[in-house]
Amino acid sequence: MTMKIKILILFFTVCCYAKGSTIPIQSDKEHNTVTRIDMSEYKTINFDNLVKNISCTRLESNLFDYGITMTTHKDRLYIMGRTIAGNKVVIFDKSGQLVKELTFADALLVISMAIIPDAEELWVVSRFKIINKFKLDGTPIKRVSLPFPCANLIPVGQQNFLVYSGGTCNSRGSIEGHFLALTDFKSINKLFLPKWGKEEWPSAPQNIYAQDEKANNLFIFPNDIDTIYSYNQQKGAVYPFLFLDFHGDFLTKDKHPYGPGEDQEMSEIITKRKYIYSHYSFNQASGKLFFKLVGKREDFCSINLKNNVLYSFNRLFDNFMPISYNPFIGSDGKNLYVLVQEKELAEHYQNIKCTYPAIQRLLPALSLDGNSWILLTIEIKE
């Protein structure tokens, strides 16, 4: 290859980046590719354009101050909620009737949960090492202590689980020097994402995993990392999938404050919005990834997995914006779930026309000072 041709190829590559195109980048020895998404090149849309339908379920009991995350299984809803005393799990049936409230002695240290379909169990993680096992109706089974840190887990078939360690530079939040491990809880089978950065205290991101069961895909978006990963079930491996290029505006692990001045530096980052310092609401629905940015940018993002087109929107249906910092608390692959208090909806629709029949039918029964929880099931267009 002549020098002129090499220069032309280099020039073309640079131009693609400058224009915000997504181009494949070789990421490993097996020629798997990661696609770059220019996060400054997005199409601003109205969220209503993505919505096919909305249905509403009033939950029977108000047992938490706000919802953290939610999962569904068969005819039940499992919501992890937060109170001043810590976290709990509340189980409802699909009609919103209370099935059971699960409270914990170490509620302040309860961090995540997962449904284990093969075992027909609910697992609740606490203290970054304890698994509290329950039957699906909330009946306690046993409490297990793990030999390695665990912030979030998800079953991936064949009695294997993908475990996120908590994301630290030390043994408090890493597994044999890595952030992700494939394990059957008898041994560590594989390790992914070598530890980096200088964070010393583990964290449990909400909605770190986004499943696309229809396409047999699992996506992972860890905290303080500007890359979305995918889990290949056939190979039993995690690969980088989408590199989100924020042009230096995203607070990655290498930029995260540490040491004696960590609290003060982090406070300044938050108050002055120096970086995008967090993301929430990571979910997949109808072939699209969703997440919300916090800090220097506060918008919602959606990436169409068919063509990698990036969309941005600032509010939800009918220009509504819930109080929660984590609006999309869950997804079943087709629907996004939003949990709001009735007074939020009542206040919003005082002077705004409602365009969704299910919400229209609900409005007359809503009170401006009502604290009942309303679960909104938002069906996303294909």
Residue ranges and their predicted role:
Residues 241-260, 306-333, 346:
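Conserved blade-ending motifs and adjacent loop-strand segments that build the rim/top face
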Residues 24, 76-82, 120-126, 159-172, ...:
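Short beta-strand elements that form the blades of beta-propeller/WD-repeat-like
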Residues 60-66, 90-119, 123-127:
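Blade-loop segments of beta-propeller domains
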Residues 61-64, 103-110, 145-151, 195-200, ...:
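Short coil/turn segments at the loop-to-beta-strand junctions that recur within blades
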Residues 65-69, 108-114, 148-156, 200-209, ...:
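Repeated scaffold domains used in trafficking and secretory/extracellular systems
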Residues 37-65:
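A short helix->beta-strand "capping" segment at the edge of beta-propeller domains
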Residues 126-171, 191-199:
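Asp-box/WD-like beta-propeller blade repeats and closely related beta-sheet repeat scaffolds
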Residues 268-331, 340:
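Loop/turn-rich, solvent-exposed surfaces of beta-rich toroidal or solenoidal domains
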